[in-house]
Amino acid sequence: QLHPAGTVLPDAVQKQIEAMPDVHRFPFDIAASFDQQGKSANQVADPEQKKAAQQVYQQAMNDRARQAAARTILRALYAPDQLRERLTWFWFNHFNVHQYKANIRVLVGDYEDRAIRANALGKFRNLLSATLHHPVMLRYLDNADNAAGHLNENYAREIMELHTMGVGSGYTQADVEALARILTGVGIDFKSEDPKLKPEQQSQLVREGAFEFNPARHDFGDKSFLGHQIKGRGLVEVDEAFDILCHHPATATHIAKQLATYF
């Protein structure tokens, strides 16, 4: 169970999953097309036609969410590696997102597959990083809006309060603000073209699927985080902060308690 050779579902179940619409399409292509569909619906001038276009858009997103839920249930019922299934459900709730915010429904199935399920039996540090790199988490907790001079603390607070150390574990508001500054520039971009940057910033740009680190939006000042001094130098600050969080005794206590309660 800890080292499954591969999930082999019964033929009938696998065929049912394979028959689902869009199952073989690249997920971020789907998300980009939905983004465009939503924008087009909002630009319709006639009120009745606009309402109809928005209803079609919402229904299409609901269909995607139901498809993802059906796939999850089929795997939970029929997959032979049940430890992976139970841990996938545990981590999916631990790193939870709300699918009815914005258009998260479109990618919630991919979030479960690539960020959670793929790392459910692995190291916590990798799981934390995988959720950060998925656009669903960044959109849900508003980090796509987090930029130098315009801090949004939602994701930073959630990481410390729920994902790692836990409430009342000794961190301060200053630590939350420092982590929010570290996370500036970490966001989403579904466009194929790169953002316009100054020549000296271009080497710092990172794009992986819909994940983007935009150095023009990052706070490059030094930070003091949980007693550690973090030099302002870009995306590597996030790795340093995550290493600090994952090695903190409060994180071990919080995660161990959550797992013990679940099992």
Model-derived regions, located:
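N-terminal accessory alpha/beta regions
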Residues: Q1-H94, H98-D110, A115-R117
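Active-site substrate-binding loop specific to GH73 endo-beta-N-acetylglucosaminidase modules
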Residues: K39-M61, A65-T72, I104-F263
